[in-house]
Amino acid sequence: MTTPILNSSVPGNIQKKSLEGTHIAISGLIGAGKTTLAVALGKVLNLPTYFEEVIDNLYLQDFYKDPKKYGFQLQIYLLNSRFQQQQQIIWQARGGVQDRTIYEDSVFAKMLNESGLLDDRDYNTYCKLFQNLSNFMRRPDLIIHLDVSPEKSLERIKLRNRDCEKDVSLEYLQNLYNAYHEFLQDISRYIPVIRINWSEFVDPEQLAQMIKAEYESMRFMNQINPPTFGNGPTTNKIISTPKDL
């Protein structure tokens, strides 16, 4: 089964290169650092920020304890929550930096289905609902994907020590990592994607400036290797690798 991510009837403004009013989505594994970068980008680009609901999520902790029992309920809850946030971004017409979008929810749902944690009946119901909602959605102008390994993701999850995430397993993160790889290959045909090696945190505001410069010249999928920030000069540079489509 394919991930239902490409049916948005209202396209993003891919040709626009000014970041004023741009809708930027930040994707990545749990604990990748999406919120940290969202705050920095919002500040540097003077865009409103929209964050993922975690603490007030009514299903998340139950899901991590028993994903097979609560998988469908969680996915419907998240789909509704992110659709509401997506509509807010559209109608306020100011753009914004969004910490995880509605499109990524379909990545989680597909992964749960393939892992046997979401049966075909529930997954098909989810996909049909997603496709119906997609008629009222607008694609982001840019996706920034924070690339971290499942091991690094789990390490950061343990460091931030949220009760609702204490049952996240490495196997779950590995399956999610694989699902993201397929998602990025698909979505980059429609929305520009910047992949960032985020294995080690760097200065988020300086990285935001790099992203701004890269977006002005990019096409399809690009990659940024952030410099190592320290006392000495930096020698790394932005590496652009457009996809061969």
UniProtKB/Swiss-Prot annotation:
What InterPro entries does this protein map onto?
A: Deoxyribonucleoside_kinase (IPR050566), DNK_dom (IPR031314), P-loop_NTPase (IPR027417)
* Active site feature: 99
Q: Which Pfam families match?
A: dNK
- Residue ranges crossing the lipid bilayer per the database entry: none
State the UniProt keywords alphabetically: ATP-binding, Kinase, Nucleotide-binding, Transferase
GO-annotated cellular components: cytoplasm; mitochondrion
Q: Does the keyword Plastid apply?
A: no
- Look up the further comments and give them: Can also efficiently phosphorylate medically important adenosine analogs, such as 9-beta-d-arabinofuranosyl-2-fluoroadenine (fludarabine).
The protein depicted here goes by the name Deoxyadenosine kinase
- The protein's organism comes out as Dictyostelium discoideum (Social amoeba)
Gene this protein is translated from: dak
